[in-house]
C-alpha cells in the first residue's frame, strides 16, 4: 500500500501548522519539510517526530532540498514573506514572485508530478503564476483562496443568528483579499434560503448590513495578525480539508481558488468559487447563478486578480 506523502515548501508559522494538522488528523504518513532555512526545516521535522508517540497514527517527518520532493503526492506551497499588519496581501507580490522564481525550477528538476496546494499570498495570483510557469494541469493546482474567508463568514453569521455554523452554507468568492464578495442570494441555513428565513422568522434572522458583515470577515485575519503575528490554525485546518478531499476522493464541494475557463465569463486566472474536490483535484466547478449585482462584484474581483497576475509577469 502506497504511503501518503506531503511536502511542505516553507516551514514557518503557516507551513509547520499545516504539517502538524495533517499529522494530528491522520491525513499523512510521511512529511517532507523544505525551507530556505534548512536548520528550521530540520527542526520542524524533529519536533513533529517527537510528537508521534502521542499521535494515534504513525507519521514520519524528514527535511531536505526541494530537488528531492519528486516522490511526494502533494506539495503545499507556503513560502513567502512574513505577513505585515499594515500591508495588503497584494503588496507582498514582489517578494513572493522572487521566491517563486527560485522554487519553480527546483520543483521541475525534482520530477514531482502530483498536486499542488498553494496557500501563499496573494493566493490567487500565486496559483495563476504557478500554473503558467510550471505548465501544470490546472485541475491539479488548488489554492486555498477564500476557504478561510468562507469559514469566517459562516462563523460571523452563526454568531449573529445564534445558530451552529455547521448549519450555514455561505461563501466568499473571487479574490482572497480586499475585493472578495459574498453572493447573498446563495446563503442557506440547513438548506433553506436566508432571505426566506428573514421573512418568516425575523426575530431569529434579522436583516443584515451586508457591507458591515463582509468588512468584519475581511478584517478577521488582521485581528489575528495584530494579536499573535500570524494566522496559523484556521489556514492549516482549511488546507488539511482540501488535502483530505483529494486523498479520500471525497467529491466534496469546497470554496477554493481554481482555474476559471469560461465560468462567470472569466478565464485564464485562479479565483474562488465552490468546486468539487476529489482524486483528480478540481473535478468540477460550481458556477453559481449570481444576481446582476453579484456578478458585477465578482467580475470586479477577478479584474483585481488579473491586474496583479499581469504585474507578476513583469517582476
Question: Predicted regions span which residues?
Answer:
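Aromatic pocket-lining residues of Rossmann-like dinucleotide-binding sites
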Residues: 22
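Rossmann-like NAD(P)-binding element
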Residues: 54-115
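Rossmann-like NAD(P)(H) cofactor-binding subdomain of soluble oxidoreductases
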Residues: 89-155
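N-terminal Rossmann-fold NAD(P) dinucleotide-binding loop
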Residues: 15-16
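C-terminal substrate-binding/catalytic lobe of Rossmann-fold NAD(P)-dependent dehydrogenases
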Residues: 134-140, 149-292, 296-315
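Glycine-rich Rossmann-fold phosphate-binding loop(s) that bind the pyrophosphate
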Residues: 11-12
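Conserved N-terminal Rossmann-fold NAD(P) cofactor-binding segment
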Residues: 36-72, 306-314
Amino acid at each position: 500500500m502506497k504511503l501518503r506523502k506531503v511536502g511542505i515548501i516553507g516551514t514557518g508559522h503557516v507551513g509547520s501548522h499545516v504539517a502538524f494538522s495533517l499529522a494530528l488528523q491522520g491525513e499523512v504518513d510521511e512529511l517532507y519539510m523544505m525551507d530556505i532555512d534548512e536548520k528550521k526545516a530540520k527542526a520542524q521535522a524533529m519536533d513533529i517526530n517527537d510528537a508521534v508517540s502521542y499521535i494515534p497514527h504513525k507519521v514520519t517527518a524528514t527535511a531536505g532540498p526541494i530537488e528531492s520532493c519528486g516522490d511526494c503526492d502533494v506539495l503545499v506551497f507556503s513560502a513567502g514573506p512574513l505577513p505585515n499588519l499594515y500591508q495588503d496581501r497584494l503588496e507582498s507580490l514582489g517578494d513572493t514572485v522572487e521566491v517563486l522564481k527560485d522554487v519553480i525550477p527546483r520543483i521541475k528538476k525534482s520530477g514531482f508530478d502530483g498536486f499542488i496546494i498553494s496557500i501563499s499570498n496573494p493566493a490567487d495570483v500565486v496559483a495563476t503564476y504557478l500554473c503558467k510557469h510550471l505548465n501544470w494541469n490546472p485541475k491539479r493546482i488548488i489554492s486555498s483562496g477564500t476557504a478561510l474567508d468562507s469559514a469566517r463568514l459562516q462563523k460571523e453569521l452563526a454568531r449573529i443568528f445564534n445558530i451552529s455554523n455547521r448549519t450555514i452554507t455561505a461563501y466568499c468568492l473571487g479574490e482572497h483579499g480586499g475585493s472578495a464578495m459574498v453572493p447573498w442570494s446563495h446563503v442557506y441555513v440547513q438548506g433553506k434560503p436566508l432571505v426566506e428565513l428573514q421573512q418568516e422568522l425575523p426575530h431569529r434572522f434579522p436583516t443584515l448590513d451586508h457591507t458591515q458583515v463582509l468588512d468584519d470577515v475581511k478584517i478577521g485575519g488582521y485581528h489575528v495578525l495584530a494579536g499573535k503575528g500570524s494566522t496559523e490554525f484556521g489556514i492549516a485546518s482549511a488546507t488539511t480539508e482540501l488535502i483530505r478531499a483529494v486523498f479520500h476522493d471525497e467529491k466534496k464541494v469546497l470554496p477554493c481558488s481554481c482555474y476559471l475557463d469560461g465560468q462567470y465569463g472569466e478565464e485564464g486566472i485562479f479565483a474562488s468559487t465552490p468546486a468539487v474536490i476529489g482524486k483528480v483535484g478540481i473535478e468540477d466547478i460550481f458556477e453559481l447563478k449570481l444576481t446582476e449585482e453579484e456578478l458585477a462584484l465578482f467580475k470586479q474581483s477577478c479584474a483585481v486578480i488579473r491586474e496583479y497576475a499581469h504585474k507578476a509577469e513583469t517582476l
